């Protein structure tokens, strides 16, 4: 669904130069908001925040399961510690079931964050009296956490950046992934026939190569890289 609202919602960030370029190609289109400094639709604002909530929860679970972070480390983060203690008070038996305790902690954390967004957003919409889409766009950010939840969620995000996203093992894997993409690009530019026929026939070769790689799954990219270079990096 490439309606205006969908495209606008997907475009979270846009430099002034890119916005001006978009405005030239589509006057009054998705670039206009970044030039006028107005807000996206309430649906787009909600999706942005829902994404952040879901990603944090998923990354906590993924990080603990992978061994990159521990529950002991997470207990230094006020938001996680609060719901972990709450879960153990409600279900003392979880003290001996760390995996279930983690799931219950995440469940409670998600529930309260969602409730906080609903309550805070409702109050903001009522306060500014936004009655239609245009008024909502001009009112500033309306979908948000309360100040308290924003601070606690921000602390969690900083923790994840420092201990998970910047973990040496993650950084090493990221570097190898970048190398794979770079080498795939070089091979396809030199040998377009290695791509699917519809991409190889494109008039702008470098753009076609970029689009072809962008459409790959991780697994397919790894297989293609090994096939074309004879090396397995990951």
What spans do the regions from the language model cover?
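Histidine-centered, transition-metal-coordinating active-site segments
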Residues: 1-234
């Amino acid at each position: 669904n490439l309606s205006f609202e969908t495209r606008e919602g997907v475009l979270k960030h846009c430099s002034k130069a890119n916005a001006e370029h978009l405005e030239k190609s589509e006057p009054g289109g998705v670039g206009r908001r970044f030039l006028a400094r107005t807000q996206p639709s309430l649906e787009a604002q909600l999706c942005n925040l829902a994404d952040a909530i879901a990603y944090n929860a998923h990354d906590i679970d993924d990080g603990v399961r992978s061994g990159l972070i521990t529950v002991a480390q997470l207990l230094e983060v006020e938001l996680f510690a609060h719901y972990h203690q709450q879960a153990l008070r409600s279900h003392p038996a979880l003290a001996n079931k760390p995996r279930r305790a983690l799931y219950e902690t995440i469940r409670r954390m998600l529930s309260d964050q969602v409730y906080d967004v609903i309550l805070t957003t409702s109050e903001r919409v009522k306060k500014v009296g936004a009655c239609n889409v245009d008024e909502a766009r001009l009112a500033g950010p309306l979908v948000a956490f309360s100040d308290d939840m924003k601070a606690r969620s921000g602390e969690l995000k900083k923790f994840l950046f420092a201990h998970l996203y910047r973990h040496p093992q993650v950084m090493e894997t990221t570097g190898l992934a970048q190398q794979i993409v770079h080498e795939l690009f070089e091979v396809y530019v030199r040998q377009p026939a290695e791509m699917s026929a519809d991409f190889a026939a494109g008039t702008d070769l470098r753009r076609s190569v970029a689009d072809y790689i962008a459409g790959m799954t991780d697994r397919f990219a790894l297989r293609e890289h090994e096939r074309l270079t004879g090396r397995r990096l990951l």
